[in-house]
């Protein structure tokens, strides 16, 4: 295919970075729930305190996004995430579910209920629990540097089908 010369324009590195960033942000915005900046597979927030129109719902998603997790294909706590989605700590999932249940409002309440239904019932990737071996806690911090994780298994139909198809 031949591109006419009048359709080609050189651009500076700064212009190119601007357009690349804009395209990236547009792609991320399309993957977030309307009225939020944190709910979805990406985020469009400009900072950690930037929330969308549904502030309470968005706050739940922001907290969840920063929670303990194992990205797809990575290993942590001796557990390898062989799925195609990020696996979350079960404590985080429990807090997220309750946070979504606590969101009220004429529009925001039903939006939070929809996010909860899609995330836990359809997506439902499962989660992992971390146990600390006897005597494994740090006396100084109380942390468990050698924790061992166990996976709960998928809880939603969508994750089960996708992981089976790709595994």
From Swiss-Prot:
Its main location: secreted. Its cofactor is Ca(2+). Phospholipase toxin, which catalyzes the calcium-dependent hydrolysis of the 2-acyl groups in 3-sn-phosphoglycerides. Inhibits both skeletal (RYR1) and cardiac (RYR2) ryanodine receptors (calcium release channels). Probably blocks ryanodine receptors by generating a lipid product. InterPro entries: PLipase_A2_dom, PLipase_A2_dom_sf, PLipase_A2_His_AS. Disulfide bonds join 39-61, 60-99, 67-92, 90-127, 132-144. One of its GO terms (cellular component) is extracellular region. It catalyses: a 1,2-diacyl-sn-glycero-3-phosphocholine + H2O = a 1-acyl-sn-glycero-3-phosphocholine + a fatty acid + H(+). Belongs to the phospholipase A2 family. Group III subfamily. Its EC number is 3.1.1.4. Binds 1 Ca(2+) ion. Coiled coil: none annotated. GO terms for biological process: arachidonate secretion; lipid catabolic process; phospholipid metabolic process. Residues 136-140 form a propeptide. This is Phospholipase A2 heteromtoxin. It comes from the Eukaryota. Expressed by the venom gland. Keywords: Calcium, Calcium channel impairing toxin, Disulfide bond, Hydrolase, Ion channel impairing toxin, Lipid degradation, Lipid metabolism, Metal-binding, Neurotoxin, Ryanodine-sensitive calcium-release channel impairing toxin, Secreted, Signal, Toxin, Zymogen. Heterodimer composed of a large and a small subunits; disulfide-linked. The active site is at residue 64. One of its GO terms (molecular function) is toxin activity. Ca(2+) binds at residues 38, 40, 42, 65. It is found in: Secreted.
């Amino acid at each position: 295919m031949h591109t006419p010369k009048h359709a080609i324009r050189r651009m500076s590195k700064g212009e190119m970075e601007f357009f690349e960033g804009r395209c990236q942000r547009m792609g991320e915005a399309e993957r977030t729930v309307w009225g939020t900046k944190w709910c979805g597979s990406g985020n469009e927030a400009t900072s950690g305190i930037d929330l969308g129109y549904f502030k309470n719902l968005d706050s739940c998603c922001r907290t969840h996004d920063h929670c303990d997790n194992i990205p797809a294909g990575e290993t942590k706590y001796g557990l390898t995430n062989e799925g195609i989605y990020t696996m979350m700590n079960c404590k985080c999932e429990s807090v997220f579910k309750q946070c979504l249940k606590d969101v009220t409002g004429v529009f925001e309440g039903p939006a939070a209920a929809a996010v909860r239904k899609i995330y836990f019932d359809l997506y439902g990737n499962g989660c992992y629990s971390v146990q600390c071996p006897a005597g494994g806690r740090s006396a100084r911090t109380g942390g468990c540097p050698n924790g061992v994780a166990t996976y709960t298994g998928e809880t939603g139909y969508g994750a089960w089908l996708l992981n089976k198809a790709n595994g």
